[in-house]
Amino acid sequence: MKILVIGSGGREHAIIRKLKENPTIEEIICAPGNGGIAADAKCINVSAIDLANMVELAKNEKVDFCVVTPDDPLAMGMVDILEMEGIPCFGPNANAAIIESSKVFAKNLMKKYQIPTAGYAVFSDAQEAINYIRTENRYPTVLKADGLALGKGVLIAQTEEEAVQAVNELMVDQAFGQAGKQIVIEEFMTGPEVSVLAFTDGHVVVPMVSSMDHKRALDNDEGLNTGGMGTIAPSPFYTKEIADTCMKTIFLPTVEAMKQEGRPFKGCLYFGLMLTPEGPRVVEYNCRFGDPETQVVLPLLKTDLLTIMRAVHDEKLSELMIEWEDKACACVILASGGYPQKYHKGYEISGLDDYGQVEGVTIYHAGTAWKDGKYYTNGGRVLGVSAVSDTLEQALQLSYEKIKEIQFTDMHYCTDIGRKVVKQ
């Protein structure tokens, strides 16, 4: 059997390494992939958003099954096009991917179906948004670009001045292009934030192990928002009682709502949750595996991943019993200095073996290149150092211990991943 995984980051590397455990898979292709993924799959340099050439590649390679994970190709209809060519896929069609590609759609969906979330207002005019801010006068307040912005289109304003600046940045300067044509301004929620990825075939919802993402670039929750600087799983805040509440009030109602709207969702649905004093509420939806959440969730999966993905595609998820390791996992991201703003590429990475690994942990490659027998930095987030152990403390300790063996110029990482829940 031949599998195509579309994407080029640490998340795709984690999916590929998990798929490799299945002996019926003869070959895994990753497009475009990266230097480290090349040790585990055949990488072919076709952009994830080049729909025509990706379909051509899938047909030429006679691919049996395709996994589409990045948000852009999902929103553009990659799954629709591949399936029209008779290639079964894991991932939602464009009609359902709107749950992530439009924050306005997601907020309106939650309002209509009474799914708990923050109070909000939608604006397509900058001056109206500024007038609203001045009238409401509530801080902190959250401003979100409607469209996809690489996980960076959310701004938290502490003052009126910052809020007005955020509106101008999103709507006038168009920092994220068309993504900021409309914006959502919403109330600031408090409480621990938890990520729950879930498999769904449009009928049944099977949540994965919970995780906690650390989004800020610097220690002590400071610095700019990033795609994620580290993760732990499971979240100690996410109790069985909270999980049951989420299933009843959020997970099932969301999947049911999408069905009612004529947008049945099949794939991995990511729930970004805030455990507020009033109960769990939705911060955001993603229509795909999170990054770097995937790098801590999939290492704990016992059931074969391809079997699950095919059951999702065939709408037979109810027939599966999905099992997880009773362990903990931590992943610390090693980033290029300057990320998420300007950074240099092309620095040699030392400390990795020929397969891009370090003994005792799993290294997931996000932004790396392989050239003349050496690994080089090639992105903002470069590597994820992921460790599995019996406790979170041990997993974090192991990750940080092994980071000492890896070096590249201007290497940056947060030293306090998991500190909120673990006394290190």
For each feature predicted by the language model, list its residue ranges.
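Active-site nucleotide/adenylate-binding loops and adjacent lid/helix of ATP-dependent enzymes
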Residues: 4-5, 99-182, 212, 236, ...
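Short, charged, surface-exposed secondary-structure boundary motifs
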Residues: 38-41, 55-56, 98-104, 218-220, ...
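Generic C-terminus detector
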Residues: 369-371, 376-424
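Active-site "cap" helix and flanking loop/linker of ATP-utilizing ligase/carboxylase catalytic domains
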Residues: 247-269, 286-358, 371
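Solvent-exposed alpha-helices and their adjacent loops that cap or buttress functional pockets
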Residues: 21, 36-38, 60, 90, ...
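ATP-binding N-terminal substructure of ATP-dependent carboxylate-amine bond-forming enzymes
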Residues: 1-94
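Internal nucleotide-binding/catalytic subdomain
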Residues: 154-294
